[in-house]
Amino acid sequence: MRLDHYLFLNGWKDKKECKRLIQTRKIIIDGEVEYNLSRNVDPQMHEIIVNQQQLTTFGHHYFMMNKAAGVLSANKDEHLPTYRDLVEEKNDALYPVGRLDFLTTGLLFITDNGPLGIDMLKPQQHVSKTYFVETWEPLEVSDRAAFEAGLEFIGGVRTQPAQLEILDVHHAKVAIQEGKYHQVKKMFLALGKKVEQLQRLSFGPLVLDEDLQPGAYRPLTQQEILSLKPYMRK
């Protein structure tokens, strides 16, 4: 959350008082004097000291879900089940960062840290996403070079270079750093291959917990939360 909002939650209700803390160098974050009230902070990732007192309350919430097929990556829907139906936490601010298609399974990152989610989806962040893919048509060695060169969709849209690891004739792992609509499926379709199964294995530094059953979720560990720190806006 923004530093000024975090200060508000911790008792500094007056904006002028918050500015005075900045001007008098009373706010220290990770050992450095902070001058930006709009920066994104979380006491689970940062050491926040105000007036020589460390603040540790009001952190954000972070979860990992193994999304099942047939579940929407949406907060609500009148007709179809959504990931939110499976989350017990009563927190309206939670949302999925980087949605998955209705039939796509795997890692879904859920948080109420809006600025973090926005920043992780920006192209300049180059957040890598890894997928397991099963195709109907057989894969070919030449497909690897095509992915590395970038592929062109109908309409002239071209992808950035991607990494394709062929596991066997019908299975592969794909790593991309973009988030175009139905991108992975369209990349294979550009090579004349239909994707039969798609599972996200990783999103940035987060890796799908193999112990999570489809539809299950858990809070991120402290180590996983800290791995997100490079994406926090300063």
Walk through the language-model features, giving the residues of each.
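Basic, flexible Lys/Arg- and Gly-enriched helix-loop patches that mediate nucleic-acid binding at interfaces
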Residues: M1-K234
